[in-house]
Amino acid sequence: MSVTKYSKPIRVFVHLAKGFDGRRWEKRWAAGQIIGINERLPYGYFRAAEDGCAVCYSEDKTKNKLEHLLGSLIMSIVGVDVLHAWRNRSRICTSDVVWTHTEIEYLAVLLLFRSLFWKRRPKLIAQNVWLFDRWQSFSGAGRFALSWLIAKADILTFLSLENLKAARSLFPNVRCEFVPFGINADEIPALMRKKAHRPLHVLSVGNDPHRDWPILIAAMRGLPDCYLKIASKKVKAKEIASCPNIELLNISSNDQFLAAFDWADILVVALKPNLHASGITVLQEAAVRGVPIVCTDTGGLRAYFSDEEIYYIPGNNPVEIQIAVMTLAADDELRFALAARAQERMKSGLLSSRCYARRHAELSRDLLAQETPSRAAELARKTAA
């Protein structure tokens, strides 16, 4: 990786979806209304200031009725919020590098670049989450249009090695990099040895579309000695109506969220096959809080945690969940060992938001360093003249 010293910070613009306005987020975070182990600003990108970046976030700007109608129309046609990017175009175009969190944002930025073709464009680090899971579902015309845009990204980044592999096969001429996701790991509570509750306290959390709730519910229905609490907007009360040992949580504050982890003996994350490391955020949150984890082995999660740190199971089989849950219920030492090793992994800092932001800073510096020789040559020519 090239490392170049700059006389001033790299100007970074983080373009996120509507609802992630930095100022509004910070107010909600301070009030404990951002659910999860989060940062004072979304995803901790601001931490790149420690690595020579001046970071600013996109703003949710008020739209009048006509703009709202236009934005909805464009969104229905192209599938991304171009108007949101347009309203942030000034700071996008005056930055050195634009960072995005998902394909929804970077595709909008690439469309903006195409529409402002006469303007200088900054570098773009384009992070992918769901796009390559869905790639085969797009029409030929859709894949062609996406490829036309993606070819103009400076770097495609991925939270999963599985996603990375798929992208490199489709876009061999575009630079693709694995950037491990990380959460705020500044405060990690001491891990306590404790006996399992009776009935066993089981927690499952998440809203990702690749959660396999039917399999988990089927597994827990057959385990009357376990009590499952689910924190998800994707599960309806009617789905658990016949399960007296399953409860839906209505979590409205971060204190309630953390209390659910403190209540749990184990966390279970049942997943459908995917490429994008579905579940990684909640796995890291559980590791920080010292909760042992059972998780489906899919999506490239082993790049984050090994089977020394997580009890991995095959997917699409409720019996495998039952075996894992009962194995951990009967073995206090195994639960403690898994939780301790996973927590040590988080303490290493390699899966922290600080490391995640630093990797973005390194990639940005590398992109800009590639321009330095030509800029220097141009300056030399002007000086000689």
State the predicted function of each range.
Residues 207, 307-318, 327-333:
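Conserved acidic donor-binding segment of nucleotide-sugar-dependent glycosyltransferases
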Residues 239-240, 298-312:
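Short acidic/histidine- and often glycine-rich active-site loop of Leloir-type glycosyltransferases
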Residues 333-365:
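A charged, aromatic-enriched C-terminal amphipathic alpha-helix characteristic of glycosyltransferases
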